Amino acid sequence: MKKLIIAGKEFNSRLFLGTGKFNSNTVMEEAILASGCEMVTVAMKRIELDDKEDDMLKHIIHPHIQLLPNTSGVRTAEEAVFAAQMAREAFGTNWLKLEIHPDPRYLLPDSTETLKATEELVKLGFVVLPYCQADPTLCKRLEEAGAATVMPLAAPIGTNKGLQTRDFLRIIIEQASVPVVVDAGIGAPSHATEAMEMGADACLVNTAIAVAGQPVEMAIAFKEAVIAGRRAYEAGLGAVGQNLIASASSPLTSFLD
């Protein structure tokens, strides 16, 4: 399986994890390690920036993991830039998951503010991974603005509804020149497999693992699902559902003749 490359950095795993909703930091850490992921995102609002010994950080920081602070909770591009600068100073990384969703009920990303913030943050030297609507035109604009990836949603955050935007995701994947990370709404390993079979470069999962009866086992299931989907894509997955006429894999014609 090919390695994933983002901003010149190689990743063996194509599964990214979020850190919210786990019932304990210990379970969160066990799930992160079991998943084999190398990219972990954490909301700045959940971290005590003045406390270098913050207990949550102790469970996230490992040598093989790229920490990806996110700006969840900000409502404007201006707030996002301010939060990003704080994150860079606090965590010593210029990698950033950009999230701007002014509506606290549905947490849908604001496209105008996201594009504006991406342009500004790239100028400031950040590696920007923007969470965005599954809008092919917007994703191209974000790419042109210098985004290191685009992260279109599959469904609203935390809903576990799967690939509700699959038709738009296909277009985004086809057009993109940067990695496409399917983010939000992935609720089952089968959803992750489908996204990877479509050609997505990675999936970001949080709720489906964190609220599972056995989060560590679910993390392993997602790890295997992402690998299976990517292998199928790289192997040249056959067209599915486009031909309604049956075709035998081992016809008996010559044998009967």
From Swiss-Prot:
InterPro entries membership: Aldolase_TIM, Thiazole_synthase_ThiG, ThiG
GO molecular function, one term: thiazole synthase activity
GO BP of this protein: thiamine diphosphate biosynthetic process
Residue positions binding 1-deoxy-D-xylulose 5-phosphate: 158, 184-185, 206-207
Protein origin, superkingdom: Bacteria
Annotated metabolic or biological route of this protein: Cofactor biosynthesis; thiamine diphosphate biosynthesis
EC number per UniProt: 2.8.1.10
Active-site residues from the entry: 97
SUPFAM superfamilies (alphabetical): ThiG-like
Cell compartments where the protein resides: Cytoplasm
Disulfide bond residue pairs: none
Catalytic activity as recorded in UniProt: [ThiS sulfur-carrier protein]-C-terminal-Gly-aminoethanethioate + 2-iminoacetate + 1-deoxy-D-xylulose 5-phosphate = [ThiS sulfur-carrier protein]-C-terminal Gly-Gly + 2-[(2R,5Z)-2-carboxy-4-methylthiazol-5(2H)-ylidene]ethyl phosphate + 2 H2O + H(+)
Keyword vocabulary terms for this entry: Cytoplasm, Schiff base, Thiamine biosynthesis, Transferase
GO CC, alphabetical: cytoplasm
Subunit structure: Homotetramer. Forms heterodimers with either ThiH or ThiS.
Protein role: Catalyzes the rearrangement of 1-deoxy-D-xylulose 5-phosphate (DXP) to produce the thiazole phosphate moiety of thiamine. Sulfur is provided by the thiocarboxylate moiety of the carrier protein ThiS. In vitro, sulfur can be provided by H(2)S.
Family under the similarity heading: Belongs to the ThiG family.
Protein name: Thiazole synthase
Protein source organism: Phocaeicola vulgatus (strain ATCC 8482 / DSM 1447 / JCM 5826 / CCUG 4940 / NBRC 14291 / NCTC 11154)
